[in-house]
């Protein structure tokens, strides 16, 4: 089963693709958000290319599990995706994914690798691989 993961943001959306056979994911180029509008063409292209069985969207919660301002935006984004693509859209806890993404990128590639787009897509990888582990249980 092919799954696309999206790390929702108001300026960039991190993207990763993976499959549940190996429970691994790889990052893809992030999608820019302009004037709070999603680039549907780029997302359509991704869906056409990868033909995912589902999309996992990062669900941003506070450390204590409560919702924050961007949580509702992510939930609304997920609803839009469900209406557009007619495939399962699954929210998955993304707490600390950005912190982990920065640590991985810094360790592998150094300080210069810490660009926002790269961090967002690495966060999407972390979200998807976490979802694979969660969905096994």
UniProtKB/Swiss-Prot annotation:
InterPro entries: RNaseH-like_sf, YqgF, YqgF/RNaseH-like_dom, YqgF/RNaseH-like_dom_sf. Its EC number is 3.1.-.-. GO terms for molecular function: nuclease activity. It is found in: Cytoplasm. GO terms for biological process: rRNA 5'-end processing. It comes from the Bacteria. One of its GO terms (cellular component) is cytosol. Coiled coil: none annotated. Keywords: Cytoplasm, Hydrolase, Nuclease, Ribosome biogenesis. It is an enzyme of class 3 (hydrolase). Could be a nuclease involved in processing of the 5'-end of pre-16S rRNA. HAMAP family: Nuclease_YqgF. This is Putative pre-16S rRNA nuclease. It comes from Buchnera aphidicola subsp. Baizongia pistaciae (strain Bp). The gene is yqgF.
